From Swiss-Prot:
This is Protein translocase subunit SecA. It is found in: Cell membrane; Cytoplasm. May bind 1 zinc ion per subunit. The gene is secA. InterPro entries: Helicase_ATP-bd (IPR014001), Helicase_C-like (IPR001650), P-loop_NTPase (IPR027417), SEC_C_motif (IPR004027), SecA (IPR000185), SecA_CS (IPR020937), SecA_DEAD (IPR011115), SecA_motor_DEAD (IPR014018). Its EC number is 7.4.2.8. It comes from Bifidobacterium animalis subsp. lactis (strain AD011).
Length: 974
């Protein structure tokens, strides 16, 4: 099926390439005109282009001249002239495509063309790279072109303060990593003041190594979190010790493919004996099951120096695709704590999610998106389906002459490693540079130790030495160099035969104290001479290495993805240079062991002589099939992550847009009045007890609720009198009007006390406080709903449909809770404590006093919430790496009706938010009719009044709702 889609996507490829060639021809015709321009004339082009845009011309109209201008400026500042294929790549990016350009084709330089062109609109261009170093390096180097043309350049890196970030985002072109851009978006939607915002919109983005960021990283949501309540450290430590006493396959089972574990009956008995409990599955022990499962996962599925490293007493995750450390990122749902307990380091507190978004949904916000990579064609269908991005293969500037040798396959890892060392030694003796690619930190260290034994000098580049990355890669193409590196995917720095000229020149100038940011004039003056000197030094060595066969890439095992294998191979043979690549495999490699067990068993049974490689088409085919199986599985996981996040994305879009409106000063006084009316209406309707006769209503319960909401002056007798002789909606309307008139009269007095501006400020601050608190609680509940939703499949119900339906109900309940709590807060704040008289005699509010009052009220209203505006900034935001495992949940024919029903309900969420003129519905319950589920679905799981004494607050509720106990039946204990 995927092959058919790929063919369909490629049908118009030839026409697109012709169109790109026409752009290159148009630019070439302008080159003579640009060459004779003075520097000042070239600098003046930017103002002319902006004027033409203002007069109605389009970016497409300006493209040939703008590209020709950038090309000429690049020649004068960097000494680099854009090739025709680079012009084609620039046009592809401008039109919102992925330009597939092989390694060494100068993708970084290509990005300058569409970046400059689109920056002319003044809305900002974002260039996304894979790490902070590349963001800084590229913004400095390519920034010389932009600054020459009067454009400002920014760079977002880890550790910058908000004021500095805002300055960088306000630049015409801003470089940074995907995580920095994504987290800034989330932080902006947690800001409390307008001047705390740093981003200014999402106009146009160019994503470098787009497959790494939008495909490989797509399974990991960006999550800003903070410590949750309770200290459960002892449980993690206790279970880390207990699982050491359990035996695999006897006490528990492990599925390495799906990364799941399951406790068996003998294991349950042992755990119950160790803990001194009668039944592990009693409601009061439910939380212990989570600790047990995480401890087993930490023991069996997450290995040190493969999945993580321990540095400075911290467990740091290693990116499985690039081999880089992911600082600040933590596994979610207690798994990271289980690993910390296993490694006997400090177990940090569990986290609660404050804000989250997937990279898929973040990048889909951009008005225009484009990307560059050397390997995108294998994922063309996914790029089109998820991001509406076409893939255009750009022809190389020079033919690729690298020789890709057949794989050598050995029976055991020991035999494979011996053959690798022998091959490297032979290449090193003649001076050919060698790059060894490994799949993990552990593998790289094993290979390094074997090279030490035979005294082959080499450099190691893995998660433990990532600071040296660019420097190591820049010299990996020199004569005799041997480099051992974890996955080279997305490394970003080209391996040039003889050495990377630009990098070496830049490093020499910086060593002398010159940089394009701090000393731009001196740097520019010294650059041509330094570059020329380095080129001369490298030139002879470059030719010598070419004669030796170029860079030899040796893969020590196949990766799960063919695309990442191709990226490793692609480090050799750049710009028409010679090169060679080969992969060494063994039947003990994880890929073969887990995904092609029958083939492995068949080959092993043949009894091959030790040390002899297997050359078999069936084995090579088996490797490809194993990779396809993993790729297919990972694609399903990504699709399901997106499906589930799309539910949250609709809700997040509404909440964040309305939050921004409040933050930026929108007058919400009428909305507050609507909150009062809506909440009181829901109270009165809730008191009806299903009867239209006022005599049957719960008047005492109604007045208790109303008095908790605001200090009403209406009496029960007055309310009964208003409803006398009326029934149904008319009776409700009469009582509601009585309460609303009373509440609004009291509320109007606030304006007299605080002044109009003071009250508007107070309204905004309270709405933000309540919205943030309720949104965090909502994320918390949605997380737990998703964790348990897979079990619905056992009842022949589609888990995704159930998640959509229940998430939709929970969203509506959150909206009503925000209204209710906002009104309650506003009426209970001590106005005397926040009012102040200004020097001119006018009234206003004391901001600090408001903060204090809000926090106090927030604690009163929501006891479970530990974080509020007062201390949120004290907690460093953390990104939790979580892979959602819903890939195996498939729709069945029986679910078609449910799918339609969920679509009808779930798709309407973006139409209904917190702010707006719509009055409260007269339907039964608290939820407006335009978004209210069926009445029987309004019953909450805890409405039966049950409690489960002894259940920990943060444990899953024994009722099976999927919520934590404190958010479910635990509420009945209050």
């Amino acid at each position: 099926m995927v092959d058919i889609v790929d063919k369909a996507l490629r049908m118009g490829e030839g026409r697109q390439i012709k169109k790109l060639e026409h752009v290159a021809e148009a630019v070439n015709k302008l080159e003579d005109q640009m060459v004779v321009m003075s520097d000042d004339e070239l600098k003046g082009q930017t103002a002319k282009f902006k004027e033409r845009l203002a007069n109605g011309e389009t970016l497409d109209d300006l493209m040939p001249e703008a590209f020709a201008t950038v090309r000429e400026v690049s020649k004068r500042t960097l000494g680099q002239r854009h090739f025709d294929v680079q012009l084609m790549g620039g046009a592809a990016l401008h039109w919102g495509n992925i330009a597939e350009m092989k390694t060494g084709e100068g993708k970084t330089l290509v990005a300058t063309l569409p970046s400059y062109l689109n920056a002319l609109e003044g809305k900002g261009v974002h260039v996304i790279t894979v790490n902070d170093y590349l963001a800084s390096y590229q913004s400095e180097l390519m920034g010389r072109i932009y600054r020459f043309l009067g454009m400002s350049v920014g760079c977002i890196v880890t550790g910058q303060k908000p004021a500095e970030r805002r300055k960088q985002y306000n630049a015409d072109i801003t470089y940074g990593t995907n995580n920095e851009f994504g987290f800034d978006y989330l932080r902006d939607n947690m800001a409390w003041e307008k001047n705390e915002l740093v981003q200014r919109g999402h106009h146009y983005a160019i994503v470098d190594e787009v497959d790494s960021i939008l495909i490989d990283e797509a399974r990991t949501p960006l999550i800003i979190s903070g410590p949750a309540e309770g200290d459960v450290t002892r449980w993690y430590r206790q279970f880390a010790k207990l699982v050491l006493k359990l035996n695999r396959d006897e006490d528990y089972e492990v599925d390495e493919k799906k990364k799941t574990v399951g406790i068996l009956d003998p294991g349950i008995t042992k755990i119950e004996d160790y803990l001194g409990i009668d039944n592990l599955y009693e409601p009061s022990n439910t939380a212990l099951i989570g600790y047990l499962n995480n401890a087993i996962k930490a023991k069996e599925l997450f290995l040190r120096d493969r999945d993580y490293v321990v540095t400075g007493g911290e467990v740091l995750i290693v990116d499985e695709h690039t081999g880089r450390i992911l600082p600040g990122r933590r596994y979610n749902e207690g798994l990271h704590q289980a690993i910390e307990a296993k490694e006997n380091v400090e177990v940090k507190a569990e986290n609660q999610t404050f804000a989250t978004i997937t990279l898929q949904n973040y990048f889909r916000m951009y008005d225009k998106l484009a990307g560059m990579t050397g390997t995108a064609e294998t994922e063309a269908a996914e790029f089109m389906g998820t991001y509406k991005l076409g893939v255009l293969p750009i022809p190389p500037n020079k033919p690729m002459i690298r020789i890709d040798q057949d794989d050598l396959i050995f029976r055991t890892k020991k035999e494979k490693l011996a053959a690798i060392v022998k091959d490297v030694a032979a290449r090193h003796r003649k001076g050919q540079p060698v790059l060894l690619g490994t799949a993990s930190v552990e593998s790289s260290e094993v290979v390094s130790s074997l090279l030490d034994v035979v005294e082959i000098p080499h450099k190691v580049l893995n998660a433990k030495q990532h600071e040296k990355e660019a420097a190591v890669v820049a010299v990996a193409g020199r004569k005799g160099a041997v480099t051992v590196a974890t996955n080279m995917a997305g490394r970003g720095t080209d391996i040039m035969l003889g050495g990377n000229v630009e990098f070496l020149a830049d490093a020499e100038l910086k060593a002398k104290g010159y940089s394009p940011d701090d000393t731009p004039e001196e740097y520019e003056k010294l650059w041509p001479e330094t570059l020329k000197k380095i080129k001369e030094q490298v030139k002879d060595e470059h030719e010598e290495v070419k004669k030796l066969g170029g860079l030899y890439v040796l893969g020590t095992e196949r990766h799960e993805s063919r695309r990442i294998d191709n990226q490793l191979r692609g480090r050799s043979g750049r710009q028409g240079d010679p090169g060679e690549s080969r992969f060494y495999l063994s039947l003990e490699d994880d890929l073969m062991r887990l995904f092609n067990t029958q083939l492995v068993a068949r080959v092993m049974a043949k009894g091959m002589p030790e040390g002899e490689p297997i050359e078999s088409k069936s084995v090579s085919k088996g490797v490809r099939n194993a990779q396809k199986a993993v790729e297919s599985r990972n694609f399903e996981i990504r699709k399901n992550v997106l499906k589930y996040d799309d539910v949250m994305n609709k809700q997040r879009t509404v909440i964040y847009s309305e939050r921004q409106a409040v933050l930026k000063g929108e007058d919400i006084h009428e909305d507050i009045e609507a909150f009062i009316s809506d909440t009181l209406t829901s109270y009165v309707r809730g008191a009806k007890n299903g009867s239209d006769k006022p005599a049957d209503w719960d008047w005492n319960g109604l007045f208790k609720a109303v008095n908790d909401l605001y200090p009403t002056k209406v009496t029960i007798d007055e309310a009964k009198e208003a409803a006398e002789g009326l029934k149904g909606d008319k009776a409700v309307d009469a009582v509601v009007k009585l309460f609303v008139d009373d509440a609004e009269a009291q509320y109007e007095a606030f304006e007299t006390k605080l002044g109009a501006d003071g009250l508007r400020t107070l309204e905004r601050r309270v709405v933000l406080a309540v919205l943030d608190r309720k949104w965090r609680e909502h994320l918390y509940e949605m997380d737990y709903l998703k964790d348990g939703i897979g079990l619905r499949g056992m009842g022949q119900r589609d888990p995704l449909v159930e998640y959509q339906r229940e998430g939709y109900q929970m969203y509506n309940q959150m909206i009503e809770a925000i209204k209710e709590e906002t009104v309650q807060l506003l009426f209970h704040i001590d106005l005397d404590s926040i009012a102040q008289t200004n020097d001119d005699g006018t009234d206003s509010i004391d901001d600090a006093a408001v903060d204090s009052a809000e926090i106090k009220m927030g604690d009163d209203v929501s006891e479970d919430d530990e974080l509020n505006k007062g201390n949120l900034s004290e907690h460093e935001p953390e990104e939790a790496a979580r892979i959602d495992n819903h890939a195996d949940e498939l729709e069945t024919a029986e679910n078609i009706a449910a799918v339609k029903e969920a679509a009808e309900e779930g798709e309407r969420i973006p139409e209904s938010g917190l702010l707006g003129p719509e009055p409260m519905s007269h339907a039964e319950g608290k939820v407006p009719a335009r978004k209210r589920p069926k009445s029987e679905e309004l019953k909450t799981p805890w409405s039966d009044g049950r409690t489960f004494p002894g259940t920990p607050k943060n444990a899953p509720c024994p009722c099976g709702s999927g919520r934590k106990y404190k958010m479910c039946h635990g509420q009945n204990e209050q």
